[in-house]
Curated annotation (Swiss-Prot):
Oligomer and partners: Homohexamer.
GO biological process terms, semicolon-separated: regulation of DNA-templated transcription; regulation of RNA stability; regulation of translation, ncRNA-mediated
Native organism: Psychromonas ingrahamii (strain DSM 17664 / CCUG 51855 / 37)
PANTHER family cross-referenced by the UniProt entry: RNA-BINDING PROTEIN HFQ
InterPro entries in alphabetical order: Hfq, LSM_dom_sf, Sm
Nucleus found in the keyword field: no
Gene this chain is encoded by: hfq
Protein name from the UniProt record: RNA-binding protein Hfq
CC annotations in GO: cytosol
């Protein structure tokens, strides 16, 4: 598993499990808001009034609305 994935997955999964609202900023500056419904290697499903599939390569930043519980530490190689 790539190091990037080993950091992304626990972070996104904690946001999903705890139903934490997030602001997702895209590389073109657009701000999307909602809750993470699901995600995989390439996309995030963001739910607000509708569900949106957002490609990860278009995402600049994911900002949780509040602090999240501790994410398990992943050892680097």
């Amino acid at each position: 598993m790539a190091k990037g994935q080993s950091l992304q997955d626990p972070f996104l999964n904690a946001l999903r499990k705890e139903h934490i609202p997030v602001a997702i900023y895209l590389v073109n500056g657009i701000k999307l808001q909602g809750q993470i419904e699901s995600f995989d290697q390439f996309v995030i499903l963001l739910k607000n009034t509708v569900s949106q599939m957002v490609y990860k390569h278009a995402i600049s930043t994911v900002v949780p609305a509040r602090a999240i519980a501790a994410i398990p530490h992943v050892e680097s190689d």
